[in-house]
């Protein structure tokens, strides 16, 4: 039974005063200050075999890191001392590990099998999860088959997901990742930005009669989402006004509008009253729960657009992939626990090597939005400066996460990683086979893609010495610019193919990595008060922009900028 946080979440000794922390500082300063990866491999012929783990379909190679066996042992001791495993078990049990909001954190329940028992406040939540999944599957099947039609009786051809944050980044990332598995007769578009241009571009070539909107907002009060949804409703009604059913053409009034809206809008929310006020039939409202954080939610009802695109069976394959890594994280011993190892390696660089960022570099065009998704997952979770006890931390927490798909990045910012002055640990994600959808000619390009994949990690690790440059006959004045010191740490994640299951495994791997780091840093990885502050201030400032109203409490800089904005806005109108 879940309940208020107890022993694992009580007062913690100051992290940097722990003997396990100071042992790592000493190790960094004395034992392994500047390990050369060339030397580490030369002195340990088994290093490549020993420094790798398997989790589900994922092979994770961490041999190209600035570590030795002692480093790993010390990091494991830090994990034990900070009770990472106790926190992990408490999360899986449904305890309220989100301490600032007093909530359970159970995104793992979203992919639990039907016969699992996971309790929140004494109630098994798994049946409710599967009830929603079954309703989603029924609705998705009706849209995909053409049984569900729009107000005029025409088949739905485009689904527009309106959400923001976790209600957009997750499903948008997964839709791109699994595009090879989508129904090509259906298109899904995503609208998130309150900038009207986002909605305009999404709708400009669509037929309202063939468009279905999914409005994703837990409270149905998210300002960006409801603003866009209201504009989308106006667009729909205006478009259908000239093409309604026979006998209804040009009809106006709430009843006619409600009929149209009910056939073209569904909601992902828990606020039935607000959903009904909007005109959406609450029978087409799919709920989720307060123990699911937005950035962990695309495998809940938030993923309805994805389920419509790839079908319920593929969606369940993805959930099964999540569950594989959940179980791995929950049960694998520390020395072979992939999320634990990845999390601890990040701490090694962020806290003991002063690395400020972390690059995630997928060698797959389909993962073009994967790093953007991880930015929210990691930076919103661990971008904190106060610990669980309310004290300002005095150690680095979450890194800046960035990256784009290879090989594009090689012709942009890899230069800085190779020869710049910053230490940037990087994850390289690749696949042994291209997706089956490709023609044989295009499949043949996959080996070239992966040749770059392996070459980059080798070059980053081992570089190119001045002697090797001279051996090529390079003039002496050109030797220094063409020398690569190497020693840039990378993790290689290799899977057979990008499938729904493998995508679920990848996302769960990073979810639990983020959890591990938050546990060590003693921060709450599941709130996001920085996001909330911005929302409050935006509501205060908006009347000054739209109406010219005085807003008390604006600082002089912002007040002056608001006045400039108003002047420029009015000048253009004239």
Kindly give the residue locations of the regions a language model identified.
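Short, solvent-exposed amphipathic alpha-helical segments in soluble enzyme
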Residues: 174-179, 204-208, 229-232, 282-283, ...
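Short helix/loop capping segments that flank catalytic or ligand/cofactor-binding pockets
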Residues: 49-50, 169-172, 199-200, 223-225, ...
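Short glycine-rich or small-residue beta-strand-to-loop segments that form or flank ligand, phosphate
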Residues: 157-163, 213-219, 357-364, 400-401, ...
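Active-site phosphate/pyrophosphate-binding segments
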Residues: 238-245, 254-438, 463, 486, ...
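General structural feature for long, well-ordered alpha-helical segments within catalytic domains
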Residues: 20, 33, 47, 67-74, ...
């Amino acid at each position: 039974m879940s309940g208020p946080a107890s022993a694992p979440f009580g007062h913690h000794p100051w992290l940097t005063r722990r003997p396990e922390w100071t042992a790592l500082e000493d190790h960094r300063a004395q034992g392994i200050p500047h390990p050369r990866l060339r030397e580490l491999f030369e002195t340990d012929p088994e290093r490549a075999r020993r420094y790798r783990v398997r989790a589900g379909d994922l092979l994770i190679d961490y041999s190209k890191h600035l570590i030795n066996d002692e480093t790993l042992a010390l990091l494991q001791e830090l994990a034990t001392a900070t009770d990472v495993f106790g926190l992990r078990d408490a999360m899986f049990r449904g305890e309220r590990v989100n301490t600032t909001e007093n909530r359970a954190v159970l995104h793992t329940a979203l992919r639990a099998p039907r016969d699992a028992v996971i309790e929140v406040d004494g109630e098994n939540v798994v049946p409710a999860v599967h009830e929603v999944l079954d309703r989603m599957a029924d609705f998705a099947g009706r849209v995909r088959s053409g049984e569900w039609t729009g107000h005029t009786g025409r088949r739905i051809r485009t689904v527009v997901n309106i959400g923001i944050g976790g209600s957009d980044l997750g499903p948008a990332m997964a839709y791109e990742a699994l595009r090879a598995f989508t129904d090509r007769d259906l298109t899904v578009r995503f609208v998130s930005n309150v900038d009207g241009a986002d909605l305009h571009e999404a709708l400009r070539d669509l037929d309202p009669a063939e468009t279905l909107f999914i409005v994703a907002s837990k409270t149905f009060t998210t300002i960006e989402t409801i603003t866009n949804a209201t504009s989308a409703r106006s667009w729909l009604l205006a478009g259908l006004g000239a093409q309604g059913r026979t006998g209804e053409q040009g009809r106006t009034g709430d009843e006619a509008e409600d009929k149209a809206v009910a056939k073209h809008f569904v909601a992902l929310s828990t606020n039935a009253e607000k959903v009904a006020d909007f005109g959406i039939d609450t029978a087409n409202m799919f709920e989720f729960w307060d123990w699911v954080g937005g950035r962990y939610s695309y495998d809940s009802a938030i993923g309805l657009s994805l389920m419509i695109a790839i079908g319920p069976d593929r969606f369940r394959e993805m959930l099964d992939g999540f569950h594989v890594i959940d179980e791995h994280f929950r049960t694998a011993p520390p020395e072979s626990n992939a999320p634990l190892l990845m999390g601890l390696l990040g701490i090694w660089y962020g806290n003991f090597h002063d690395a400020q960022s972390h690059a995630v570099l997928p060698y797959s065009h389909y993962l073009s939005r994967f790093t953007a998704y991880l930015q929210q997952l990691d930076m919103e979770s661990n971008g904190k400066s106060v610990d669980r006890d309310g004290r300002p931390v005095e150690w680095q927490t979450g890194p800046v996460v960035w990256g784009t798909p290879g090989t594009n990045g090689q012709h942009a910012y890899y230069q800085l990683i190779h020869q710049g002055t910053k230490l940037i640990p990087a994850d390289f994600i690749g696949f042994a086979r291209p997706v089956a959808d490709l023609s044989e000619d295009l499949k043949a390009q996959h080996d070239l893609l992966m040749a770059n994949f392996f070459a980059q990690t080798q070059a980053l690790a081992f570089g190119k010495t001045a002697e090797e440059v001279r051996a090529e006959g390079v003039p002496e004045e050109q030797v220094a610019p063409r020398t690569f010191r190497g020693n840039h740490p990378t993790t290689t994640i290799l899977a057979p193919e990008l499938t729904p299951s493998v995508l679920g495994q990848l996302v769960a791997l990073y979810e639990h990595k983020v959890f591990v780091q938050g546990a060590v840093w003693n921060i709450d990885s599941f709130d996001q008060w920085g996001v909330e502050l911005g929302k409050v201030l935006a509501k205060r400032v908006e009347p000054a922009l739209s109406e010219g109203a005085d807003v008390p409490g604006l600082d002089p800089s912002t007040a002056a900028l608001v006045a400039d904005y108003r002047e420029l806005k009015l000048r253009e109108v004239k």
